């Protein structure tokens, strides 16, 4: 037995007899997962808590339950609290629970334990992150050595059997020879603590480190958050529903951002092309994985130490870590006090939260409610969910929809263009590789020529906006790209279209002189600044007014520089935006709106769980489908080898996808890659490695899958494939980081080749493609818990990025329990592509695929699936889209279709439809108008229905209970 600082092996001859650790039950998905905001750390039922003793803050007892056995408790070295190694009613041991929730990772054993007062650390390098640590046995029997997973466990050593490295944490608790399990008698005396209490106690400790379980026992009243509705009586009810959810999300985002202070960082200094100082810093994997950072985020960098007077500077993030480099780069704003560039250590960085995006969403809701000119009457009532008469625009259609010297449209694309040009509201569903960007660009081109008016083109992300702006530029349109001030120094593929660059290039006279003076001096006088701002604003307005198309993000549409009306708004990737986000460009005076997206792929990212559960994670695109608005689907895919498109087409698009490329066009001749079936470039390679907790304690990795991933990439390199052609997709940040590290340490070819291979999340690959995709599933445990691999949308994206070849690495035993993955495995088996063995000797996999058990869940009519926790099975319809009524994203569609078996509901729908048929008849004389945009006209024409509609809304709410009669629908 040795102390922590001596870096000598641990003598375990007197330790518990089970030191020869057998493969243990694997980690459960109830551990917190990165990018998984809906997942809970714990899922167990509440347990009674009376009659047990409370832990004492003055001794070495568990801060959760009070167990004080020296052999069972471990100290968290960050907060100096003690925790036991038992689960006792929770999904993870108390010490692991605490480490995960607190983001701590250094522990030490009790002085009276078998191993003594020992800080657990790596024998070679001294790293103390317990989530990184594992053990290997010495060639002599009675000694083990602790090594970190990477790099030390990857280093060959004659004295240690590093191939047998095992993590110290298995089954979500420390191995029993590190910290024993308490006796049954000790468990009975301990206080039972619920997962909910643990979460509250950890939150309490952030503000009061001396808090105990007694401080959180008092029940707290929490205001109930009503779910969003399908239909709204008026815009005020709409605003009252969405406004609180936006505030919830904003408050959560603010708390998250402001908690991300980075202390004791080392900085390297350089100069940007504009002569501004750049501060670059690298964080540990643990720290960088926890950060939620985007290009353009504002930060404060400051120094306080003995070597220089206190200094503080502000700037914007201009570069983030990626597959090719691991640094964050901050561009500092000009300041009278220069930064201490001669210093590199002792700096602290803090993020500045800005609620601009949330403020603009709230403003859009208010504008929608009170400004009748913000949107046409037709669109107003459509968004509220009222049944209004469909109208069409009497516009001259082009003889040919395809544009000369541009991509030729197929029939489904031409149909989409024709439909959109004549309708005030259109939904275009673009499955993977179907050319929705080409279709969108063609639509914008024709609308610009027909109406001779500016068009506002938006998307949730800057990448999507830039991509579409480039296409529109290629069509010869005058395109202006509006970016946030914080992103003006970030280079992109369309920087030449950026408004600030157009202002600089077109500056004349006084403005040109002021720009030159500003560049030379760095700062203008107060009077010059005032004049400069005025001239810039005037020039910006002139440029925007002369544009054919203005491109910006949805949030960017709320910029004051766009304080004008736009008749036509097109939103690309609209299914990735929340509804209030989409509303920002729409309330710029829209009379014609085109939403482009795919609700079978990834949806909006909502961090606050309550807001997500209440419905904020549903896009406007999806809700309109639920209201019966049928999207136009693009049906010809040009990306994937037809063998790769077969399963996604049948599973997610009712087999409607046609192939615009042949097998020959997507087959590499003379390839020597060992595909199981020659001519079918896909395989599911069964991997039976164990999942492990990653370095940050909140994610997962799988070493066997990472090792085989490197072997596949090396094999592709030897087959002539370039690094830029390969993409590795994994849902877990822990696996992403580990694969990058593993390839650099163990790749058998030039290390620079492996650096150029992109390894990223499913989200990062949405809308993109690679010639070859490797999908690492990671999850492998006896509980068959697969986390957010259950989300069909994530699987759809992962399966549809590859053009020439797809390799899936996963454990079929764990995945087969899920209905969707079961179908996928059966598909690969039927094709002869479900294999196991070594890459050079693949054999058909003989593992038995256990039939998944269907789950029956009762939900109210308007309820949504919690994608991460409830998507175990499909809705029981004959197809997977049910005529755009029920999608895998879990949205229940039109009542008249979804519940046709219920007489009362059918009668209700029919009566409502009859009323609106009368309205339609009365309105028919106005159907041929080019545009109906007077909200008062609709109000007058529909006044006889308003009171009926209000009553029907109330009846609709009362019918929630009827959903219990429809459990046979499986939704």
UniProtKB/Swiss-Prot annotation:
- GO CC terms of this entry: cytoplasm
Q: Where does Zn(2+) 3 bind?
A: 122, 125, 148, 152
Q: What is its EC number?
A: 3.6.4.12, 3.6.4.13
Report residues binding Zn(2+) 2.
Answer: 76, 79, 98, 104
Q: Which GO terms describe its molecular function?
A: ATP binding; ATP hydrolysis activity; double-stranded DNA helicase activity; mRNA binding; ribosomal small subunit binding; RNA binding; RNA helicase activity; single-stranded DNA binding
- Name its cellular compartments: Cytoplasm
Instruction: Name the Pfam families on file.
Output: AAA_11, AAA_12, UPF1_1B_dom, UPF1_Zn_bind
User: Which GO annotations describe the biological process of this protein?
Assistant: cytoplasmic RNA surveillance; DNA recombination; intracellular mRNA localization; nuclear-transcribed mRNA catabolic process; nuclear-transcribed mRNA catabolic process, 3'-5' exonucleolytic nonsense-mediated decay; nuclear-transcribed mRNA catabolic process, nonsense-mediated decay; protein ubiquitination; regulation of translational termination
Residues modified as Phosphoserine are 56, 869
Q: Where is this region: C4?
A: 122-152
List positions binding ATP. 413, 433-437, 601, 638, 769
Q: What is its main location?
A: cytoplasm
What keywords does the record list, in alphabetical order? ATP-binding, Cytoplasm, Helicase, Hydrolase, Metal-binding, Nonsense-mediated mRNA decay, Nucleotide-binding, Phosphoprotein, Zinc, Zinc-finger
Checking PROSITE patterns in the record gives:
UPF1_CH_RICH (PS51997)
Q: Which InterPro entries match?
A: AAA+_ATPase, DNA2/NAM7-like, DNA2/NAM7-like_C, DNA2/NAM7_AAA_11, P-loop_NTPase, SF1_C_Upf1, UPF1_1B_dom, UPF1_CH/ZBD
Amino acids binding Zn(2+) 1: 62, 65, 84, 94
Q: Where is this region: C3H?
A: 62-94
The reaction(s) this protein catalyses: ATP + H2O = ADP + phosphate + H(+)
Matches recorded under PANTHER family: DNA2/NAM7 HELICASE FAMILY, REGULATOR OF NONSENSE TRANSCRIPTS 1
Q: What else is known?
A: Present with 6090 molecules/cell in log phase SD medium.
Q: What is this protein called?
A: ATP-dependent helicase NAM7
Q: Which organism is it from?
A: Saccharomyces cerevisiae (strain ATCC 204508 / S288c)
Taxonomic lineage of the native organism = Eukaryota, Fungi, Dikarya, Ascomycota, Saccharomycotina
Q: Which gene encodes it?
A: NAM7
